[in-house]
Amino acid sequence: MKNNLPIIDLFVSIQGEGKRAGHPSLFIRVSGCNLRCYFSGSICDTPYSSYNNEKSKFDIADVLSIIDDNPQVEDIVITGGEPLLYQAGVLELIHAIDDRLPNKHYITIETNGSIALEGEGCDLMTWVDLWSISPKLQNSIAPVGTKIEVLGKTVEFTEDVVNRLNEKRKNIDAISEIVVYGRDYQLKFVYSDENTITYIDELLGEIRTVLHDEYKYVPDFNSHVMLMPEGITEEQLQSKRQSAVNECIKKGWMYTDRLHITIWGDKRGY
């Protein structure tokens, strides 16, 4: 794992998704991701942290400065990109935050769940309050031959690229470890259409098998699985909301919206 921590966004807003939706939060976004997501013609909503990685703009001192300026904000969200590419760096950051805000912080790590904790990164289990896991399903990979323009660059999904992404996009063992040992977690899925439910059921079945066979653990997913409508505009979200809610009611899962898009649109830094 890489030890540096390329922070490219640093801002205070509200959490727009998941169990902590509505909480004032300090967002720390790192650059770099091991996946390249593509949903029904739209791509990752932060391509500057995945498709075309920006260089680091901030350091830990900048994070602490914003904390000093906003002592009322206790939720800290470490997002990306994929933060678990930088486990040692994330741990160093959390230690610094804890020194500045002892016992007054709530740490969320947003991850795609495809990278296992290793080495000193395993200590993150001690510090992270909420693991926000967004597993990438079959509907997150572009069809072979797709070409898209992203931030001035042409990205082509060749057969080799698609195969590699499909191999990397899920890590059942890594997710299962968080389910068992993490303080709290949420499995947050982007809802595209009815096929999404089939894919989720398949993934949950794989996780249940590992939990049963390796940990003798029977999970209650209903209080942890969340559906979120696909979209990066209010119009796109609205077109998926009712179907997503209906599926949540059928399955006993939770629904989460994307409040930041409803309020600010797909603007960076909100």
Task: Please provide the spans of the model-predicted regions.
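Short, charged low-complexity linear segments at domain edges
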Residues: 1-25
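Conserved AdoMet/S-adenosylmethionine-binding subsite of the radical SAM
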Residues: 85-270
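Solvent-exposed, flexible loop/coil residues
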Residues: 18, 52-55, 141, 268
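Conserved Radical SAM active-site core
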Residues: 5-8, 24-25, 35, 39-129
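Short, glycine/acidic-enriched capping/hinge loops at junctions between secondary-structure elements
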Residues: 18-21, 38-41, 268
